[in-house]
Amino acid sequence: MAKKLKIKLVKSPIGYNRRQRATLKALGLRKISDEVVHDDSPQIRGMINAVIHMLEVKEIEN
């Protein structure tokens, strides 16, 4: 089975550049404490790595 990632926004994007805010929007995160679940893929991992300082990430089994 494919792994999934549970991603939670824990820090506000205020004060960060437009590209990082756009990455959060692409992940589906808008407000602090928002959580989303995505399939584990290289594309999602790359987006997470770009804004890892604002996120909390957990791997979950489906």
Swiss-Prot record:
GO biological process: translation
InterPro entries registered for this protein in UniProt: Ribo_uL30_ferredoxin-like_sf, Ribosomal_uL30_bac-type, Ribosomal_uL30_ferredoxin-like
SUPFAM superfamilies noted in UniProt: Ribosomal protein L30p/L7e
GO CC terms, sorted: cytosolic large ribosomal subunit
Family matches, as Pfam families: Ribosomal_L30
Keywords: Ribonucleoprotein, Ribosomal protein
Stated family: Belongs to the universal ribosomal protein uL30 family.
Record-linked PANTHER family: LARGE RIBOSOMAL SUBUNIT PROTEIN UL30M, MITOCHONDRIAL RIBOSOMAL PROTEIN L30
HAMAP family per the UniProt record, alphabetical: Ribosomal_uL30_B
Protein name in the entry: Large ribosomal subunit protein uL30
